[in-house]
Amino acid sequence: MVRVIAVSNPRLAQAFVDYMTTQGIELRVHNTGEAAEIWLADDSHLEQVQHELQQFLIDPLNSRYRAASWQAGNTDADLHYQGFSYLQTLRSKAGPLTLGVMALCIVVYILMQILGDDTLMYWLSWPQDSSQYLQLWRWVSHAFLHFSLLHITFNLLWWWYLGGPLEKRLGSGKLFVLAVVSAFFSGWAQSLFSGALFGGLSGVVYALMGYCWLSGERAPERGLMLPRGLMVFSVLWLVAGYFDILGMSIANAAHVAGLVLGLLMAFWDTRHRAHNEQ
């Protein structure tokens, strides 16, 4: 049995379970009092369930979900849909650390628009010389700097999509360690090529991509996954950055370092399971 997700609205959980029943996949709802947990009996269907869940959370009011509830005989499954919102979707998939980092990045971005990039870079950028080495926040705070609306939107969507489930399943501590370590090493790698003039959460995002993808491949029961198609796209995007065909400045070294680190951490965390299967 694999826990797929926990949601605050039990009617919503039942609607998704009913829909997956029409797809030939058995899910169960367990009410804990604080949330409704959805569990998957056969983990070989985990990737399909995760994909369908993403579509469901984007548009839970879609008629196909209501139709599935009627077909399954749960005709009251849609009575409380009006209480669901995009904010609830955001919160249901993310823990406090995921949401906190998103809020911090947004605040820093707004301040950069008001005070200018240079002001925030002065306080948050990667250490420029040895005199700043003891300003310990600089080793990770560069990840909160974003230089365009597209930059911050792209990174925060990926951070929420990958970091939220990781925090929900493995805890805030695991996400914190992965984020801090990947911010440090991706920043160090990028500084070798561009000095201290860089910023963004993309090094951490690539670490999450590597971690979630390899964890899903080696230990699907952990409940983490990244579809192979998205992983291929991410690697192609990384490669495209080296050929300057995207027409924008990209921290390529940070991306590579983050991806490699995420893969290594996932390999280490799943080593015992792989050993036990041999």
Swiss-Prot record:
Pfam families (alphabetical): Rhomboid (PF01694), Rhomboid_N (PF12122)
UniProt-listed Enzyme Commission number(s): 3.4.21.105
Entry's localization field: Cell inner membrane
InterPro entries on file: GlpG_N_sf, Peptidase_S54_GlpG_N, Peptidase_S54_rhomboid_dom, Rhomboid-like_sf, Rhomboid_protease_GlpG
Gene Ontology CC, one term: plasma membrane
Active site: 202, 255
GO MF entries: serine-type endopeptidase activity
UniProtKB keywords: Cell inner membrane, Cell membrane, Hydrolase, Membrane, Protease, Serine protease, Transmembrane, Transmembrane helix
Membrane topology: Multi-pass membrane protein
GO biological process: proteolysis
Catalytic activity: Cleaves type-1 transmembrane domains using a catalytic dyad composed of serine and histidine that are contributed by different transmembrane domains
Superkingdom per UniProt: Bacteria
Transmembrane segments: 95-115, 143-163, 170-190, 192-212, 224-241, 245-267
Function noted in UniProt: Rhomboid-type serine protease that catalyzes intramembrane proteolysis.
NCBIfam families, A to Z: PRK10907.1, rhombo_GlpG
PANTHER family assigned: RHOMBOID PROTEASE GLPG, RHOMBOID-RELATED PROTEIN
UniProt similarity note: Belongs to the peptidase S54 family.
Name of the protein in its database record: Rhomboid protease GlpG
Gene name of this polypeptide: glpG
